[in-house]
Swiss-Prot record:
Cofactor note: Binds 1 divalent metal cation per subunit.
Species name: Clostridium novyi (strain NT)
PROSITE patterns assigned to the protein according to its UniProt record, in alphabetical order: ISPF
Protein name: 2-C-methyl-D-erythritol 2,4-cyclodiphosphate synthase
Encoding gene, per UniProt annotation: ispF
Residues flagged as site, Transition state stabilizer: 34, 133
Protein's pathway: Isoprenoid biosynthesis; isopentenyl diphosphate biosynthesis via DXP pathway; isopentenyl diphosphate from 1-deoxy-D-xylulose 5-phosphate: step 4/6
Pfam families membership: YgbB
GO MF entries: 2-C-methyl-D-erythritol 2,4-cyclodiphosphate synthase activity; metal ion binding
Length: 157
């Protein structure tokens, strides 16, 4: 068995959609980034790639490549799932946390789990998503950005 850890952070800004776990969340600010800036999916991808010793998302989907500009991170997650399969790994479980002062994530978590499980061709009970705040502390607590952490367990087939 192999374990992987991922982390991502993006700045909140105007005139962008807020996409987390492939879900568009109604909010006056969105995340700034080359792709759709889905910090949850980016952290999950990095944890999976790390567990398989396949590098990180910057290696596979560089922000210097215009073909990834504005791309849905869910499409990239599917590619990561294919990479794991091609390298004879199966996902045991994923556990991730979204760190954001606002908006509240609870109404969207079930749909995020469905999206992630579907993209990776795994069962929903293999994916856990949580959300927390930093009690007004730091850049996420001040509402300047959103971050996410992910840990996963994979196994050779």
């Amino acid at each position: 068995m192999r374990i992987g850890m991922g982390y991502d952070v993006h700045k909140l800004c105007e005139n962008r959609k807020l996409i987390l776990g492939g879900i568009e969340i109604p909010y006056e600010l969105g995340l700034l980034g080359h792709s759709d800036a889905d910090v949850l999916i980016h952290a999950i991808m990095d944890s999976l790639l790390g567990a398989a010793a396949l590098g990180d998302i910057g290696k596979h989907f560089p922000d210097t490549d215009n073909k990834y500009k504005g791309i849905s991170s869910m499409l990239l997650l599917k590619e990561v799932g294919k990479l794991l399969n091609e390298n004879s790994y199966e996902i045991i479980n994923i556990d991730a946390t979204i760190i954001a002062q606002k908006p509240k994530m609870a109404p969207y978590i079930k749909d995020m789990i469905k999206n992630i499980a579907s993209a990776l061709c795994i069962n929903e009970n293999q994916v856990n998503i949580k959300a927390t705040t930093e009690e007004g502390l730091g850049f996420t607590g001040e509402g300047l950005g959103i971050s996410s952490q992910s840990i996963c367990l994979i196994n050779e087939k």
